[in-house]
Amino acid sequence: MLAQLTGAGKVPAILVLEDGSVFRGVSIGATGKSVGEVVFNTSITGYQEILTDPSYARQIVTLTYPHIGNTGTNSEDEECKTIWATGLVIRDLPLLASNFRNSQSLDQYLSSKNILGIADIDTRRLTRLLRDKGALAGCIMAGDVDEAEALETARGFAGLQGMDLAKEVSTKDTYQWRDGSWKLGSGYAPLAEKRFNVVAYDYGAKSNILRMLVDRGCDLTVVPAQTPAADVLAMNPDGVFLSNGPGDPEPCDYAIDAIKVLLNENMPIFGICLGHQLLALASGAKTIKMKFGHHGGNHPVQNVKTGEVMITSQNHGFAADESTLPDCLEATHKSLFDGSLQGIHRTDKPAFSFQGHPEASPGPHDAAELFDHFIELMQQRAASNV
């Protein structure tokens, strides 16, 4: 039994879903009670990057791969210093964590961040349930467990639709970012050559997105989600990046209004994930809540024009509705899993976006060329201003 292997299993834990389903297991991490929308991620590796992705705010993350924690945790694989997810669900926590960068076990890491987790449950059963019924509200209780209280807590969760979480997870202060990608033996590479001044809106930005922009010569100024467009334009940027983030895009009026102003200024714009949805809304399209969303590192996406297929990392529960695209937007990419819209480009402005994660931390970098297209748009703008 897991309890005999880890020492953490002496503390009982339960996961109760709003439909009344109960999963009994053992506690990892903190004790107490947490609630959120329960989703599943199919990635095999990268559990620390997944946990620290701000897009999981108010969500309990189920990892479908059975062995989680094999490599421990470290200070370099965090996408954000804060864990915004409200819980973690796994099958097995291995006895040993083996990696030359390991500094803390997963159990210790969760405890240090005050995050609840539950292990030793049938994650296959849970995943099938979420696949069939859609994402459900759930409550994890660890320590003194009470099924009735957990069920009441789960059913009291308001859900993510209509919830603006971007302003909650966003930075509160403007700051500079000049760290590039990580390299073995040397750590994060500094900005080598400044080619462009880019303002990045932080709606819950993953650090690896910022690193890949720096790799391409972007000197980044990261601003809070609610920063007015006038303040951004006063910084005289060569381009504006719209980050990923959690929650429903529709309530983010401040972001939609700012993007409209930037579009009117013909500013080169690149959006990822939530940023993609916000660009769609600012351009006149609508968004929808998905049944259980896309969460994983093996999602095939096709380029509509070229037919090229790339394997992508995905993490979203909302999507832009292709049937509502106005004439100024063209669909550029589609999911080969369900046909949902994955990319758009303005036909009249230097602005485009992608639903998946081309920076893929964790996951493949098949779509990294999208960063290069952003560079091309900024180069074209610079050439036209000569």
Curated annotation (Swiss-Prot):
Pathway noted in the entry: Amino-acid biosynthesis; L-arginine biosynthesis; carbamoyl phosphate from bicarbonate: step 1/1; Pyrimidine metabolism; UMP biosynthesis via de novo pathway; (S)-dihydroorotate from bicarbonate: step 1/3
SMART domains: CPSase_sm_chain
Annotated residues for binding of L-glutamine: S55, G245, G247, L274, Q277, N315, G317, F318
One of the protein's GO biological processes: 'de novo' pyrimidine nucleobase biosynthetic process
The keyword Lipid metabolism is annotated on this UniProt entry: no
Catalytic-site annotation from UniProt: C273 (nucleophile), H357, E359
Pfam families: CPSase_sm_chain (PF00988), GATase (PF00117)
Domain Glutamine amidotransferase type-1, chain residue ranges per copy: 197-384
Example GO molecular function: carbamoyl-phosphate synthase (glutamine-hydrolyzing) activity
Annotated family: Belongs to the CarA family.
UniProt-listed PANTHER family: CARBAMOYL-PHOSPHATE SYNTHASE SMALL CHAIN, MULTIFUNCTIONAL TRYPTOPHAN BIOSYNTHESIS PROTEIN-RELATED
Main function: Small subunit of the glutamine-dependent carbamoyl phosphate synthetase (CPSase). CPSase catalyzes the formation of carbamoyl phosphate from the ammonia moiety of glutamine, carbonate, and phosphate donated by ATP, constituting the first step of 2 biosynthetic pathways, one leading to arginine and/or urea and the other to pyrimidine nucleotides. The small subunit (glutamine amidotransferase) binds and cleaves glutamine to supply the large subunit with the substrate ammonia.
Quaternary structure annotation from Swiss-Prot or TrEMBL: Composed of two chains; the small (or glutamine) chain promotes the hydrolysis of glutamine to ammonia, which is used by the large (or ammonia) chain to synthesize carbamoyl phosphate. Tetramer of heterodimers (alpha,beta)4.
Name of this chain's protein: Carbamoyl phosphate synthase small chain
Annotated source species: Teredinibacter turnerae (strain ATCC 39867 / T7901)
Protein encoded by which gene: carA
